[in-house]
Regions:
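Membrane-interfacial loop-to-helix junctions in multi-pass transporters
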Residues: 3, 70-73, 100-114, 142-148, ...
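Transmembrane helical segments that form the transport core of multi-pass membrane transport proteins
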Residues: 288, 293-440
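Structural signal for alpha-helical transmembrane segments and their membrane-water exit/capping regions
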Residues: 2-3, 13-57, 78-91, 261-269, ...
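Alpha-helical transmembrane segments of multi-pass membrane proteins
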Residues: 108-120, 145-159, 182-200, 204, ...
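Interfacial loop-to-helix junctions that mark the boundaries of transmembrane helices
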Residues: 1-3, 21-27, 59-71, 182-190, ...
Length: 530
């Protein structure tokens, strides 16, 4: 009975978002309100649980923890999105997109460059729906039908969400568990390293069918190369550097290696153009691929080395700052020593490292990048204004979900759910752990929010079953990433940019299969690791 009561807030959020199609902000508020009611009436928060501080002290502590964690996450989201909007305003994004498009006339190669490397790069730098919204129109511009464009961009982007927006999904996990960020990033990356090639192969199969061709031997080779050049650097960065740069840095390193090989092959042997490709590509019919490497409207964009450096300045500065503050002890040690901490009676605590926090590094990257790009003040103001407007529903949803999660933890509701899960699933829980992450992302539209909702459940269940906690937390973060291609919010945002509004179900039907396969593979690995 108590387990059912404990599950009610999560079930309510599911019902409101999936059944009534409420936004995450409204559903989160309703779920948080119900969680508070159940915590007080059903679990005795303030009387049987935390009696020393009483109900008022318990509610104040929960609100403080939720508000503090929300602020640390928003400190990342705000400058990350501001950089993205500044890039759009200054034309930096167009330069990067067109430079990729001019590398090959084969739309399947362009799918690797845009739906894989470009979306992963943007996911690492900004995340929160921007990669697919940006990549889908460009894929349509090089000839893919809108439905195919959104599907392959969603699948490609999903591999990098575990470390999206400079590692934002890891932040609530650190706050909830106390594990070192490096431990959590390493535990998450191993799943993508093992199976990340699977969604990429599916992505390329769909892209090839979209061009009226097949997965030929050469495309298999390019696909495997694209997978290896991203997944290996991503894993290495996550394991030895930290959670901020695996997706962004992995995409940058992988793209550089892939493009270098592409240019060498084109120079020595020639990359196939449309006329040299498999039958049906050059005349794929209405909506089929064009041979131009970039949309006509962007044909005159400057893609010289100087223009590319200027366009990528915010991200290059960010990478430099992250490496300096993580790998150079004379810089990192004194900065890490500045920590702000707070605590309230009842064991409510929080800490913040302002000088090395990813949000601070993003703010510096935004300001220095704007200087390099010589962005006018109106463009800076416009980027910030757009970002602040975009943050309103995100802030409400994030705070509501955190209130729900922290209420459940502090009242013992999460512990009760964990005991029920341990009793009913036993040895099968590791297989299900990634699917829990998928469910969270499906409901909330955010890998970060999924981790907010279910990190404590994963920890408590691991303790109940006697499993090693880190592999299950890695599986949670992995699942939160895997669920991105079926998140309705993300599908709506991506589809809207290419005129697919109202056809979201068609996208989901094409992404749900690989989502479930990828998650189950991760679950089988989790079973071995725990």
């Amino acid at each position: 009975m108590l387990a059912l009561l404990a599950a009610l807030p999560i079930l309510l959020v599911l019902a409101l978002m999936l059944g009534l199609r409420w936004p995450a902000s409204r559903a989160g508020i309703a779920g948080a309100a119900l969680a508070l009611l159940v915590a007080v009436v059903g679990f005795g928060l303030g009387t049987e649980v935390l009696p020393d501080v009483g109900l008022a002290g318990s509610l104040a502590g929960v609100a403080a923890e939720a508000g503090f964690t929300s602020a640390t996450i928003l400190w990342i989201i705000l400058p990350a999105l501001a950089i993205y909007h500044l890039q759009v305003a200054t034309g930096g994004t167009d330069v990067l997109r067109v430079a990729l498009g001019r590398l090959s006339g084969d739309p399947r190669i362009l799918a690797l460059l845009i739906a894989w490397f470009f979306t992963l790069f943007m996911e690492g730098g900004a995340g929160f729906g921007s990669p697919v919204a940006l990549a889908a129109p460009f894929l349509v511009g090089v000839g893919y039908k809108p439905l195919v464009a959104v599907v392959i961009a969603m699948i490609g982007n999903g591999v990098g969400v575990s470390f999206g927006a400079i590692g934002t999904p890891i932040v609530p996990m650190v706050a909830a568990t106390g594990f070192d960020p490096l431990e959590l990033s390493a535990a998450s990356a191993v799943y993508h390293l093992a199976f990340g090639i699977v969604p990429l192969v599916v992505m390329m199969y769909i892209a090839s069918r979209g061009t009226g061709t097949r997965m030929t031997g050469s495309i298999w080779g390019w696909t495997l190369l694209a997978g290896a050049t991203f997944l290996v650097p991503m894993w290495a960065i996550a394991t030895y550097v930290g959670p901020e740069l695996p997706t962004l840095g992995g995409a940058l390193v992988g793209m550089a290696l892939f493009v270098a090989v592409l240019l060498l092959v084109r120079r020595w042997r020639g990359v196939p153009e449309a006329s040299e490709m498999d039958p049906g590509t050059a005349d794929a019919g209405a909506g089929g691929p064009r041979t131009s490497g970039a949309p006509d409207a962007l044909a005159d964009v400057d893609t010289s080395a100087r223009a590319l450096l200027r366009a990528g300045a915010p991200y290059l500065i960010l990478i430099t700052l992250v490496l300096l503050t993580r790998l150079v002890p004379p810089v990192a040690d004194p900065l890490d020593g500045v920590v702000l901490r707070w605590s309230l009676e009842g064991g409510f605590t929080g800490s913040f490292s302002p000088l090395t926090h990813p949000g601070t590094l993003l703010v510096l990257s935004f300001l220095l990048g704007a200087l390099v790009q010589r962005a006018a003040l109106p463009k800076l103001g416009g980027a910030l204004t757009t970002t602040l407007k975009q943050l309103v529903p995100v802030t409400i949803a994030l705070l509501a979900m955190l209130l729900l999660a922290r209420t459940m933890v502090r009242s013992g509701m999460t512990e009760e759910l964990a005991q029920a899960a341990a009793g009913s699933t036993a040895s099968a829980w590791p297989v299900l752990a990634p699917l829990v992450g998928v469910l969270g992302t499906f409901v909330t539209g955010s890998g970060t929010a999924s981790n907010v909702l279910f990190t404590d459940l994963q920890v408590a269940t691991a303790e109940q079953l006697g499993y090693d906690t880190l592999p299950l937390l890695g599986a949670q973060n992995f699942g939160a990433s895997v669920g991105n291609p079926i998140a309705p919010h993300n599908i709506v945002a991506g589809g809207a940019t290419v005129g697919l509004t109202g056809s979201e179900a068609d996208v989901m039907r094409r992404t749900i299969g690989i989502t479930l396969v990828y998650a189950v593979l991760g679950g089988l690995l989790a079973l071995l690791l725990v």
